[in-house]
C-alpha cells in the first residue's frame, strides 16, 4: 500500500476512535467519507477491510455502525496472575488466602513474570504513593524486603500494604498518608513486594 493510502487509513482509524470516545458509538460509512475527505463509500469500505485484516477493528456486516476498536492489549502476550482476596491499605483485615480470580496481565507490564499475585487495594493509607482505593496491586512473592520497599506484611494473620523500614530495634510499617500513624512491631512476616499497580480508568 502506498504512503497516501496508509495515511488515509490512519485518518479513518483515528476518526473512528475519536467518534467512539466522544459519542459512545461508531460513525457511519458516509460520516467517515465526509470526515476524511473520501469521495465514495467504496473507498471507506476498502480501508475498513484493511483495518479489520490488520486486527485493529472488528465489524458486523449485518448491522450499520457496527465497528469496534480492538483493544491493543488483547494482541499482546499475557500471563494469568491470581487475584488473592482483598488487601486493606488502611486498617488491616483478615488475609484471604484463596484465589478469587485470575487477571490476564500483559507480559511486558512487569519485568519478572514468576511468583506474582495480585491484591485489590481497599482504603487510602497509600494515596501519597499513588496507590488508590480499588487498584490492583501486583505483588512479587518474597519473604524479605529492603528499607523503603512497599510490601504486603502479615501481622497476627492480618495482611496490610505499607512501606517497610527496619530500624535498630523494631520494624516500622509506614503508611503513605500524613494523617495516619506508622505501625511499630518487633517483627512481622513479609509476604511480598509491590512491583506494579494496575488501574482501570
From Swiss-Prot:
What Gene Ontology terms for biological process does this UniProt record contain? DNA repair; DNA replication; negative regulation of DNA-templated transcription; proteolysis; SOS response
Disulfide bond entries: none
Q: Which residues bind DNA?
A: 29-49
User: Do you know which Pfam families this protein is assigned to?
Assistant: LexA_DNA_bind, Peptidase_S24
Task: Report if keyword Hydrolase is assigned.
Answer: yes
Q: Does the keyword Hydrolase apply?
A: yes
Q: Which reaction does it catalyse?
A: Hydrolysis of Ala-|-Gly bond in repressor LexA
* Site, as annotated: Cleavage: 89-90
User: Single GO molecular-function term?
Assistant: sequence-specific DNA binding
GO CC annotations?
protein-DNA complex
Entry's EC annotation: 3.4.21.88
Outline the subunit composition. Answer: Homodimer.
Assigned protein family:
Belongs to the peptidase S24 family.
Say what the protein does. Represses a number of genes involved in the response to DNA damage (SOS response), including recA and lexA. In the presence of single-stranded DNA, RecA interacts with LexA causing an autocatalytic cleavage which disrupts the DNA-binding part of LexA, leading to derepression of the SOS regulon and eventually DNA repair.
The protein, known as: LexA repressor
- Its source organism is Clostridium botulinum (strain Hall / ATCC 3502 / NCTC 13319 / Type A)
Its gene name is: lexA
